């Protein structure tokens, strides 16, 4: 079942009216103070500090793993949707930096397209949350890979970060700070203490949220959906970080991470000493987010929408109204060489993203049709010359020899013409192949949609108007951004 359809069938809040109904909800009483301290340390632009004032109205929140150079372009599309909705409601646009995520495979690669060749930097990262991974050991490799772009003042600022998640937050500030985007890193020393009350409550009933998820999963399954978050017996929604981040299980009045056992008191003492060591799993993270932030709207991708749909019971358990849910905008950047190819074949960029080579060949068929029709007419002339010889044999034998000479001349000329046609076809086929390769490299790199591979910061570094075009784009649906 499509995620958006599932959300409608579950009756979950969607749309701007639902967002407006959730404004003026209070966040954590120390939120603005903590965020101001965090942003001051990151030397955020003035527009971001002004956006903090709009937290009194509410927040439209989105988030993503802390990928290199801001991660794939979908990060900026999420931020764009959140900022547009926030502006329309008079609220603040907040970006949750998923610094607690320890799936480093999601964040260790950086793909750039330069001189029509995709280039990849892959960092060897430890299996730790990105908020724990220092940037210093990787800074020079990043600079070398970025080349002349590393001298751009925005990247110079971002590369001063101490951790991978801070690098990500600084990229957001460098490129989207002027629009007032507020990054929020839950592992930042200024912000992690805001979650202590939520952690204490979860430790007091460690299986309650997991049971709520499983009940909702059964409801979704009854509707024909496939819930992604079903919890195993004894699994909590909390991770403990020791030498690595491990899921906690609860049984017989005690917790275990598979290495040792803990009492609730011991875990609480760990959290009080360093609240960033005890972090929520996916089934609890949005709720923890909304216990601290005055979230009125939540911008997600299609896969996120599926798991958020399972969380209504967890929200109810914490006495929270679920925020209004919005799908992010989907984007594809079209640079001048690609635009010329698309226009030549009258091909929509989204058709190529959806269908790839099949869409291109279908569009190219019309371009090849006149060429093929001409070749067929030449073949028809040869066949007509042969038929004339056959008719002459029956009609007048004296016509046979001259018609055979005529046929031979036609055949010779046709053969020469055929060779020229084949050469022209080969050249045209090479043009087609070259155009197809270029479209794939730009729009479907590695067989994936462009927005899931190349960072939008790459386009902003290459085209001065890229950020303006994004700011002017629709906040929802499919958007083609023509640059250059």
From Swiss-Prot:
Coiled coil: 372-435
EC number, as in UniProt: 6.-.-.-
InterPro entries for the chain: Bacillithiol_biosynth_BshC, CC_BshC, Rossmann-like_BshC
Enzyme class: ligase
Record flagged with keyword Isomerase: no
A Pfam family it matches: CC_BshC
Segments passing through the bilayer: none
GO molecular function, one term: ligase activity
Keywords for this protein: Coiled coil, Ligase
Family statement drawn from the similarity comment of this UniProt entry: Belongs to the BshC family.
Protein's UniProt name: Putative cysteine ligase BshC
């Amino acid at each position: 079942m499509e995620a958006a359809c599932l959300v409608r069938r579950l009756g979950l809040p969607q749309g701007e009216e639902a967002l407006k109904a959730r404004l003026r909800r209070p966040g954590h009483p120390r939120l603005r103070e903590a965020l101001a301290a965090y942003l001051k340390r990151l030397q955020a632009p003035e527009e971001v500090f002004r956006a903090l004032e709009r937290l009194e109205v509410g927040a439209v929140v989105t988030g993503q793993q802390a990928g290199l150079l801001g991660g794939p372009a979908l990060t900026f599309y999420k931020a764009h949707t959140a900022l547009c909705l926030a502006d329309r409601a008079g609220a603040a646009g907040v970006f949750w930096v998923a610094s607690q995520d320890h799936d480093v495979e999601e964040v260790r690669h950086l793909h750039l397209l330069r001189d029509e060749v995709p280039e990849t930097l892959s960092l060897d990262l430890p299996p730790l949350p990105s908020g724990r991974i220092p940037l210093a050991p990787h800074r020079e490799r990043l600079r070398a890979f970025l080349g002349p772009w590393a001298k751009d003042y925005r990247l110079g600022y971002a590369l001063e970060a101490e951790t991978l998640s801070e690098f990500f937050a600084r990229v957001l500030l460098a490129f989207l700070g002027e629009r007032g985007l507020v990054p929020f890193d839950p592992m930042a020393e200024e912000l992690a203490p805001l979650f202590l009350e939520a952690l204490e409550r979860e430790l007091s009933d460690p299986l309650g949220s997991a049971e709520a998820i499983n009940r909702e999963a059964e409801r979704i399954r009854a509707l024909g959906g496939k819930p992604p978050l079903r919890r195993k017996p004894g699994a909590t929604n909390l991770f403990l970080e020791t030498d690595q981040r491990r899921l906690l299980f609860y049984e017989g009045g005690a917790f275990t991470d598979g290495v040792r056992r803990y009492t609730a008191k011991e875990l609480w003492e760990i959290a009080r000493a360093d609240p960033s060591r005890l972090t929520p799993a996916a089934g609890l993270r949005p709720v923890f987010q909304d216990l601290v932030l005055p979230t009125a709207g939540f911008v997600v991708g299609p896969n996120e929408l599926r798991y958020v749909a399972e969380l209504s019971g967890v929200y109810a358990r914490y006495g929270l109204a679920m925020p209004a849910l919005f799908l992010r905008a989907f984007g594809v950047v079209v640079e001048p060489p690609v635009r010329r190819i698309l226009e030549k074949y009258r091909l929509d960029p989204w058709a190529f993203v959806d269908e790839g080579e099949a869409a291109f060949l279908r569009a190219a068929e019309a371009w090849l049709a006149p060429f093929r029709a001409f070749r067929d007419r030449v073949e028809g002339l040869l066949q007509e010359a042969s038929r004339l010889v056959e008719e002459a044999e029956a009609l007048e034998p004296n016509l046979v020899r001259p018609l055979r000479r005529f046929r031979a001349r036609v055949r010779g000329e046709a053969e020469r013409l055929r060779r020229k046609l084949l050469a022209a076809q080969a050249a045209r086929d090479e043009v087609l192949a070259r155009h197809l390769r270029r479209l794939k490299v730009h729009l479907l790199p590695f067989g994936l949609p462009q927005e899931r591979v190349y960072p939008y910061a790459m386009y902003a570094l290459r085209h001065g108007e890229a950020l303006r075009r994004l700011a002017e784009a629709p906040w929802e649906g499919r958007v083609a951004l023509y640059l250059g």
